[in-house]
């Protein structure tokens, strides 16, 4: 059987036991490590009295190993130089939080890049952070991670018109709250640090997909499955047919993520 099962990346830190198996998962974003202390007694050619003490140990970013920092100083410097490279400029800031109110410069920028770089008819994209910001002025490599923090690749898929419509209906159904005083699906909570009331979205921001390259409207008062009305392609496409369209999206979404 399996004595210890160690997981990673799954977003919820967890220490658990099931039968004789110990499970430890450190969570995401390298904020903790899974640690299991094992003690046993060797008897002849086998081990007896095995005990497992699992824990999730939080990492303190302020307690840096000096020897490790010295060992990797040249690598840290190389990354710093690379991320400081200018790649362009902006005449206005890009704010990901504006995506939740409708069309905005941030989400339009993602759609533009995906369509222009792939040649696709349509783009699916989502705000990958709630409050990512790039100020106006010079844009550097490190700024791009503020609005696009994940290492996805760009995929292009062929989809029918009905599939595109169903995709958008599903996306907006996860966000729109028709039978409520709120426009979007939010839930109340409590800030554990202050004890004050707080609010959060029911869904993850990176699942709030919209479409670029399409002229369409969303009726927030309509029932689920009847909210989207697609009017036309935003740009002429010689390759598109009434049945099949090319759609650019992240590899995460193309493989079924979200």
Give the residues covered by each predicted segment.
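Feature captures C-terminal
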Residues: 108-258
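Basic, gly/Ser/Thr/Pro-rich low-complexity segments located predominantly at protein N termini
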Residues: 13, 32, 50, 82-89, ...
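A short C-terminal boundary segment appended to hydrolase-like catalytic domains
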Residues: 40-139, 147, 199, 223-225, ...
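Active-site-adjacent helix-turn-beta-strand microarchitecture at beta-sheet edges
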Residues: 1-85, 175-179, 183
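N-terminal catalytic scaffold of extracellular/periplasmic and nuclease hydrolases
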Residues: 1-42, 96, 100-111, 115, ...
